[in-house]
Regions:
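Membrane-embedded beta-strand positions of outer-membrane beta-barrel proteins
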Residues: 24-28, 69-73, 117-121
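Transmembrane beta-strands of outer-membrane beta-barrel pores
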Residues: 30-36, 73-81, 121-129
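Residues that define the transmembrane beta-barrel architecture of outer-membrane proteins
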Residues: 3-7, 22, 43-51, 65, ...
Length: 168
């Protein structure tokens, strides 16, 4: 149980090459969450900031459907805070991933009013993640220089993540 508040900003722009068929997309997501365990004795607070940049190629179909497909790079960072954890009450989360980006757009006209429908899919494929060992303190990582194994490789075999967005 809990709640999450977030805001997203996205900017699309046609690139100067490719006869208007290539677009670039900048997306920034910021959110904060506060969650509690079902028994009420666990509590987790998190904040995250994500930025992604992608380039997408545009296909236009005679029926009015527009399909954009391409790749993107995403940078993420944030903090998890667990008040019950005495060793590391706050944990940093960072990642960088490369993936696919898809977008389907269709505009429905009701009278004079256009109603655009858009579905977006982001599917990370390869990435690197900051992931300390369980129970490893930041004192051990940064002061004692125990850096081995804190950056992990990620792909579909150990971190499947798919972001979907539907807008009307």
């Amino acid at each position: 149980r809990g709640y999450e508040l977030g805001i997203m900003h996205e900017r699309l722009r046609v690139l100067p090459f490719g006869n208007g068929k290539w677009i670039m997309r900048h997306r920034i997501d910021a959110y904060a969450a506060n969650s509690f365990s079902a028994s009420g004795n666990g509590h987790l607070i998190s904040t995250m900031l994500d930025y992604s940049y992608g380039q997408l190629y545009t296909y236009r179909f005679p029926c009015g459907l527009v399909w954009r497909t391409g790749g993107e790079i995403e940078l993420s960072g944030g903090v998890l805070y667990n008040p019950r954890n005495s060793n590391n009450p706050a944990a940093a989360k960072t990642s960088i991933v490369l993936g696919f980006a898809e977008m389907l757009t269709y505009t429905l006209h009701i009278g004079r009013f256009p109603i655009p429908f858009r579905y977006q899919l982001s599917l990370p494929v390869l990435g690197a993640f900051f992931s300390p060992a369980f129970g490893e303190s930041y004192y051990e990582i940064f002061y004692l220089k125990n850096h081995s194994g804190i950056v992990k490789f990620g792909s579909w075999h150990n971190r499947f993540d798919m972001n979907n967005l539907l807008t009307v």
